[in-house]
Amino acid sequence: MAETTTKDDKPLFGRPWIFIRGVPSMKFLPPEGPAEIAFAGRSNVGKSSLINALVGHKGLARTSNTPGRTQELNYFVPDGYSGEADDLPPMALVDMPGYGYAQAPKEQVDAWTKLVFDYLRGRSTLKRVYVLIDARHGIKKNDEEVLALLDKAAVSYQIVLTKTDKIKAAGVPRLIAETLDKIKKRPAAYPEVLSTSSEKGAGIEDLRITIEQAVAR
């Protein structure tokens, strides 16, 4: 008799993914249960593009050249799951609002900031946060503030360098070494820095592997 394959048996990144909801405040969060992997970073660092590259669906997470476009916690899950309590997925990816965007109204920025900080501090199913850093700029003050928050909340995080195709290839190892040096004393930082290019596909498979490992823990 042939074995029956269920939707739970498929590889996490070997299937289509869908958007299930945008969360403007904590009360709209989906039921806790599946492992959650979140992506944080400055506005226009490339979070949406990276998520699209991860799942192999260019139009899944909306991308924009306008900083501050993502204003909610956007949830993505493997296709075939609703994300409701009776149909929980094996994992969810969470695209968080970008920080450090000075052009938005202060009230709006404050609301985004509170949402992100409340989520990071209070979500028990959050397995890891990937903090995206633009390879052209390195770690900035806003990034350091977020890393400090994650350290304080004891939320595991890993640095991902984005847009590495925009700098000289010889500069990538040096940037990785400099970044590792900056985070070596941070208690919640995962001691490995990933380098990626959503446009070229570089480092995407390595990122998938680390996500699967984080979810399995």
UniProtKB/Swiss-Prot annotation:
Its cofactor is Mg(2+). Keywords: Cell cycle, Cell division, GTP-binding, Magnesium, Metal-binding, Nucleotide-binding, Septation. Residues 33-217 form the EngB-type G domain. The keyword Transport does not apply. CDD domains: YihA_EngB (cd01876). One of its GO terms (biological process) is division septum assembly. GO terms for molecular function: GTP binding; metal ion binding. Transmembrane segments: none annotated. Mg(2+) binds at S48, T70. GTP binds at residues 41-48, 68-72, 95-98, 162-165, 196-198. Necessary for normal cell division and for the maintenance of normal septation. It comes from the Bacteria. InterPro entries: G_ENGB_dom, GTP-bd, GTP-bd_ribosome_bio_YsxC, P-loop_NTPase. Belongs to the TRAFAC class TrmE-Era-EngA-EngB-Septin-like GTPase superfamily. EngB GTPase family. GO terms for cellular component: cytosol. The keyword tRNA processing does not apply. PANTHER family: ENGB-TYPE G DOMAIN-CONTAINING PROTEIN (PTHR11649:SF13), MSS1/TRME-RELATED GTP-BINDING PROTEIN (PTHR11649). This is Probable GTP-binding protein EngB.
